A protein has these predicted regions:
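An N-terminal, well-structured beta->alpha segment
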Residues: 2-100, 107, 187-224, 235
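Conserved phosphate/anionic-ligand binding catalytic regions in large, soluble enzymes, centered on
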Residues: 36-56, 140-141, 227, 231-243, ...
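Glycine-rich phosphate-binding loop plus the immediately following alpha-helix
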Residues: 153-183, 321-344, 349-358, 427
Length: 557
């Protein structure tokens, strides 16, 4: 691509969006290069990028081009193509959703769109419930406010496969971004019936499916739990509070500053419940209210973070690994106790999620399926079980990045489900005088202490992209040890190990049951390092983990 010529073409043609047109006129040479040096990547996660002008940005033109390519793909593969669309609270999410709807409608693809912003799992659910050919969710999940994205689901409600993504990309690459995109007005589509709003009955059916995930099986628990909840200015407020209240949890305080949808995320620039800064305001509320439990969901409500009181009365944040282990153990224990464990039960987790999950699963007779990072791979495995007539064999799936799913009604992680099940689990143990931290200690005593941490490193722009590639190559080199722990084996998933698809992931198995995993983020210009340390106790584990991090960071120089 001739960057200068493409920039000038945009100056001449990108006039429909005033923001884009104005930004184009202000770009200097360096910014022009970054905005036009490539097209936004389209893969199994769809599109994700910074909102702005250019081929490497999220804007109405890149969204329309992707939608045209998807429409062409759907028309080739379905006699009567259709799509379900949703959007979150991010900047321009509603605009992008309506642009996508207009492109689909102009191409004869029937559109069902949520009338208001909704969590990402409701798009997976609506795709399945309405039997549409595909689903589209406009979201950038937990990324900072400057990002947005375009997530694509297949007819099964699971994110598209690698093969489907390649076919859609091939259609997109045939298109000229200005000359080849068909578009009809959104309001006109509503008037002529090519675009329809998804009815309330679908939302009610989704909430009922979440409620059906309960594993109390008639047991009575104390639901007078003081809950502080934050939707982090996203989509979770109505579905989470509705579900909790309908299940008997009425003592809910919502963090006022983070209650209403706001794509600027004014109180938490990085609205990710994995990060303690995003939980800080909720923690303040919890202290003021003397809450039993703090819950927070990310903007598209597919991740849940929690905090509970320790014995000293101070609030502790639990990691995604810890919450996932607790949920897995609780669900399995309840199913076994009530005779509700299915035949050949299955637990699914990602390869960067702590191995203790597999130990817990084995204890209860579950088979563990390990998949690549990304909940789409968990959804894909649920789909395989469904095709075998064994969807009920799926018991639980989780990933360390705060994503959980307890049923097969959707094919993506569900923060509404996660929030409810965490509250139920908390109530169950509280009724017996047991805290979640007590239960966690019990699991550590049974299976051994294990510390799992995640470290992220940002590399912006084209230079940053090249730097990440060079670091990955360095980690493929002959590194003998990290933090004094010898490398026993290097697993390079770029070669498709263990029957998994090829992926840019490196895992170094270290002595003493420790490991380090390095991979580029699929959604941001970041490298992620996952460290797992087994030790006698937390203090010893933290010391080893610190030394491993120091050694790993030397390769970033």
């Amino acid at each position: 691509m001739d960057i200068k010529k493409e920039y000038e073409r945009w100056l001449a043609n990108a006039t429909a969006d005033a923001d884009v047109a104005a930004e184009l006129k202000t770009l200097d040479d360096a910014k022009i290069e970054d905005a036009f040096y490539r097209d936004l990547d389209f893969g199994t996660g769809g599109l994700r990028g910074v909102i702005g002008a250019g081929t490497n940005r999220m804007n109405i033109y890149t969204v329309a081009k992707a939608s045209q390519g998807l429409a062409d793909y759907l028309k080739k593969n379905f006699a009567e193509p259709s799509v379900a669309i949703g959007y979150d609270s991010r900047i321009k999410s509603d605009v992008f959703a309506k642009v996508a709807a207009g492109v689909f409608a102009a191409n004869g693809v029937k559109v069902s769109i949520w009338p208001v912003l909704m969590p990402v799992p409701t798009v997976s659910f609506a795709t399945r419930y309405l039997h549409t050919s595909a689903g589209v969710m406009v979201t950038a999940s937990h990324n900072p406010s400057k990002y947005n994205g375009y997530k694509v689901y297949g007819a099964d409600g699971c994110q598209i496969t690698t093969e489907a993504a390649a076919e859609i990309l091939a259609e997109i690459e045939k298109l000229d971004i200005f000359a080849d995109v068909k578009y009809s007005d959104f309001e006109a589509g509503l008037a002529n019936g090519n675009v329809k709003y998804i009815p309330d009955e679908v939302y009610a059916a989704f909430v009922n499916e979440v409620k059906n995930q309960s594993v109390l099986f008639g047991e009575e628990v104390n639901k007078d739990v003081a809950i502080v909840y934050s939707p982090l200015n996203g989509t979770g407020l109505k579905p989470v509070t509705r579900t909790l209240k309908e299940m008997g949890y009425t003592n809910i305080t919502v963090v006022k500053e983070q209650e209403q949808p706001d794509g600027n995320f004014p109180t938490c620039p990085y609205p990710n419940p994995e990060i303690k800064e995003a939980m800080a305001l909720g923690m303040e509320y919890a202290k003021k209210c003397n809450a039993d439990l703090l819950l927070a969901t990310d903007p598209d409500c597919d991740r849940v973070g929690i905090a509970v009181k320790n014995k000293a009365g101070k609030y502790e944040l639990l990691t995604g690994n810890q919450t996932g282990m607790l949920l897995l153990d609780y669900i399995c224990c309840q199913r076994v106790k009530h005779g509700k464990m299915p035949t050949d039960p299955v637990m699914i987790k990602t390869i960067v999620t702590m191995d203790m999950g597999e130990q817990i699963a084995t204890h209860y007779g579950l088979r563990t399926i390990n998949v690549l990072t990304g909940f789409k791979f968990i959804g894909e495995q649920i789909g395989k079980l469904e095709k075998q007539g064994r969807a009920d064999s799926y018991v639980f799936g989780f990933e360390e990045s705060y994503g959980y799913l307890t049923g097969s009604y959707v094919r993506d992680k569900d923060g509404v489900d996660g929030a409810y099940m965490i509250c139920e689990m908390f109530s169950y143990y509280a009724t017996k005088g047991i805290s979640l931290l007590d239960k966690l200690d019990e699991l550590y005593k049974t299976y051994g202490y294990c510390l799992n941490t995640l470290h992220s490193y940002e590399f912006d722009g084209s230079a940053g992209f090249a730097k990440m590639q060079s670091i990955m190559q360095a980690f493929r080199g002959n590194i003998k040890a990290f933090g004094g722990k010898k490398v026993v084996k290097l697993l390079d998933y770029a070669y498709g190990l263990d029957g998994l698809p090829k992926s840019e992931v490196l895992k170094s198995l270290l002595e003493d049951d420790c490991s380090i995993v390095v991979r580029p983020s699929g959604t941001e210009p970041k490298l992620k390092i996952y460290i797992s340390v087994s030790a006698e106790n937390r203090e010893a584990a933290e010391k080893v983990e610190c030394e491993i991090v120091k050694d790993a960071e030397k390769w970033f120089a």
